[in-house]
């Protein structure tokens, strides 16, 4: 028999406690103390009470309570819906029951007295009481350590008493729970075979379902292949849209005629049905009359009426067959309409593709025209700039020519003066200073040669100017064609550079001539001073000198006037050419505007054609919708007619069966029984007749309402305008699909939350059980050493927290996008429904 547990503060008795300290690892014992009761077994359950073992309080190796850092509940793996195996649960409960039996709790009403057993029980009770007293002492010590000197000791003692009372109640409840657990384990032994059978049947069902899934997957793949082949066929049959459209119109007209014929036939059949119903009513009336006549006459009439009923049944069967034929025709028409719808969809796709091609071609043509206009405007601007630059160059050249003319005139005046002076010197000196005169004559010849050279350069510049003007005119005439503009611009730039270099050379030559003139002036002044000294006394021949000088002046004036007139003509020619260039530029801009106008007209025409095509497409869709509605209504009418015919045939068969039964009963029974049966069947017949009449009235009223509705529909078919498009249907489909996916996701989230809360509740219940066991077998707080790793965050917790934050952010973004999409689709559908004019 085991010793009683020692004091709670003893470090050497920790191994006898139920719970090991947190973080404390038990050392393996080499020798186990002898146990008095060798037959008793230890419980396999982790939750053991003091009454479970004879070795003292039960023991349990417990892990460190890391509830703060533990993320086992929040892992994805914890959301596993699999239940624990039944064998484990049964083993736990069975062991519990066997332990209860071994411990002797259920053996109160045993057989003969056993002194050893009684001693064991008394010792066990004493151990339990001792343990409870120690727990109380420990709890009292805790409370006393925590109590202040403010008079709270009595309150704490009262709380301790209440705790003890509740512990006693808990022990009683625990005993009741154990008894119930025993009963439950006994009942579960019986149910285990049933559970195994259920598991086998479930496995069989799973296998069959997997086979069905494989079959469905194969069917899906086959259907996908069929869809792909059909799509390929549809893509191949896209050619010949106009012929298909004409065929569709022809087929639709034929189908409309066939539908009209079927409606007329249905109306005729309805009339025949009404006639048959009237005949049935008449027959029923005759049957009522025949009931009052003699039995023989009734039999004969019944036979005749039964034959008539059979004839009517045959007629009804023929009518049903005709209905079936009409339904077959309707199905064929529906199939034809479906094929026509497919052709319409292909036509619509082709029209959309053509519209896209037209829009692309229109955009390309607009881009090309814009680029051409921009090129022409840029070329006209360049030509204008070049014309302006050429005008400036011409003005500069004219100003330079005027300056040169003035210089030439001055040089000519100086030459005349020198000639006069030479003549005077010749007259006065007659041979004096011949060397000086020769030098002056040489200088005069040099000046004349320079003047001639300058005149030649002027003529060359004028020729270059004329050439430039001709080139400008040629370029202006060739500008509409826009040929080799870059090359001509380069040539013009090169020519302009040549002209500039030529102007620079002329300016340099002018500078040289200016220097020479300055030198000549200096020499002239020096010579004039010398000549003045020589001509102080020479005053003869002044009249002749004056005349010669006047002649020279008149000649020079004439030359100057001729030069001015020639320049005026050149300026007028330049102005005319400039005006011509301006007019040609205006003509080019006008041609560009006319081309733009023509392009805009062509664009408007194409836009009209596109609008017409769109209108045709919308009309085709409207016709298709009308045909669909009419077909649906015709199908509904056909189905209603079928139902009515089936009901009537069933009722007629029932009536014939009743008549047959009536005949048999009449032949078998006597007259009294026959009278009773006649009364019974007459009442039944009247009741059925009334029901049939009521139903016939209801059906007639429904037929009249349907006919009125069809007539109103036919009358209002031409007046109504529908602007329903496939886009609204697509938007509605997208809206409801998105809403459905959102609801499915919401339900999945709710299921996950529910599972999570269930698992949290289970875990919390498990923690509560563990806390209760701790309170029952309370250990001192000083028995557990302090561990440094307690309360420390782990990398796994931080990583899971970050992952959860990322998932929450993604889900919130997706929800926001879905809500925005739903709002947009809802507004769009509302706007499109507002646009519909019924």
Curated annotation (Swiss-Prot):
Region described as Disordered: spans on this chain: 1-67, 187-209, 287-310
Positions with biased composition (Polar residues): 287-303
Classification via InterPro entries: Spc110_C
Coiled coil: 163-644, 682-709
Location relative to the cell: Nucleus; Cytoplasm, Cytoskeleton, Microtubule organizing center, Spindle pole body
Transmembrane segments: none
Predominant subcellular localization, coarse grouping: nucleus
Keywords: Coiled coil, Cytoplasm, Cytoskeleton, Nucleus
Pfam families cross-referenced by the UniProt entry: Spc110_C (PF18520)
Cytoplasm keyword on record: yes
GO cellular component: cytoplasm; nucleus; spindle pole body
PANTHER family cross-referenced by the UniProt entry: CENTROSOMAL PROTEIN 2, CENTROSOME-ASSOCIATED PROTEIN CEP250 ISOFORM X1
Assembly mode: Homodimer.
Purpose: Component of the spindle pole body (SPB) required for the proper execution of spindle pole body (SPB) duplication. Potential role in cross-linking filaments or anchoring other molecules. It is essential for growth.
Family recorded in the similarity comment: Belongs to the SPC110 family.
Protein's recorded name: Spindle pole body component 110
Organism per entry: Lachancea thermotolerans (strain ATCC 56472 / CBS 6340 / NRRL Y-8284)
Gene name of the record: SPC110
